[in-house]
Amino acid sequence: TIDAIASAYLWLMLESGMSVWFCGETASGKTTLLRATCVFIRPEAKIISIEDTPEIIVPHDNWVREVTRQGEDTESSIELFDLLKASLRQRPNYIIVGEIRGKEAYVAFQAMQVGAPVITTFHAGSVQKLIQRLTGAPIDIPKSYIDILNCAVIQSAVRLPSTGTLERRVLSINEIVGYDSVEDRFDFIELFSWDPVSDTFIFRGEGSSHLLENKIAIMRGIPRRRVREIYKELENRAIFLEKLVEKGVLDYFDVWKAVKVAWKVGVEEALKMVLRGEEIWKY
């Protein structure tokens, strides 16, 4: 579905409090990937998940699961919109929504605006369709607010040319840069893209990421003259994840334990521990 460097990028995004939306058509694997990436959220974070059907498992200690309820009438029903509004009063560090479909998107943007990252799935097959749905009726997000959403992951079920089998792949990972009111256009950077011929992921490379250089590097205290360090951090995280796969560490909770060690001692030190043969996923 996704390779190590793209996974490492999502790790940096989620750990740093960026809002990431997993988008695609029906049965494209959106919820599965969202659920898998929850291990990248900071271990001490307070997380609220909101769903119609409880599917998402969050391994964190400070996790509150909220589920909608269908009553006999509108007064006894509890909708996503209601839970999302109520969640803001609980001051979460992260809000996870199973799927955003309608008016609750407006509340999600309010949450992101006040500093609560929202991680969710959304039915859209491209960045253009995502923006079109968000800015059109009935959601009607103002165009100038769109860059409050940091990152859009576009997924699809695809038939591989080499085998003819149906697989799920991330088609692209995109950074939302902003809205140009003069040109009336939205600017975004396709940082990762999937090549169907080779079934590999293409990363645009150093110097191409708006979020890494202008948000996350600053948050981590990296000055502009040393901005290459954020790409080195990305590379270290990718190698760390590759080593876990090489050692057969595929269980969700084992990966979570390994990521927690990396959070505690630093990714570079955790990588050294793995290379020395330490089984940090058993800690």
Report residues per predicted region:
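Conserved P-loop NTPase
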Residues: 151-241
